[in-house]
């Protein structure tokens, strides 16, 4: 079974929030490695923000269900985007029996979009 999440965000909106709140915004939403990778570039920050929201949707939690930093956007060795889950996001994925998460990101001058597919295993959850 598959679950999906998609999100689109206006890059100027992220720039406005970054201009207004600066490091406070970055520290609330992004991990240190995401902050380093994006280096303050609004298109990159917007794309990662969209991935986080799309992942929350694929997990069925919404933005109130997990912390922003429970979802970290990383790069595979191939350069493809992926996510690492922590905290409540990881627990939710385990409950759903997520065995794989695929991520696609794109952005233009004005918008960033992310599409996330979570593949669920058909195996019953093991009880300890």
Predicted regions, residues:
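Core catalytic alpha/beta fold that binds nucleotide/phospho-ligands
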Residues: 1-128
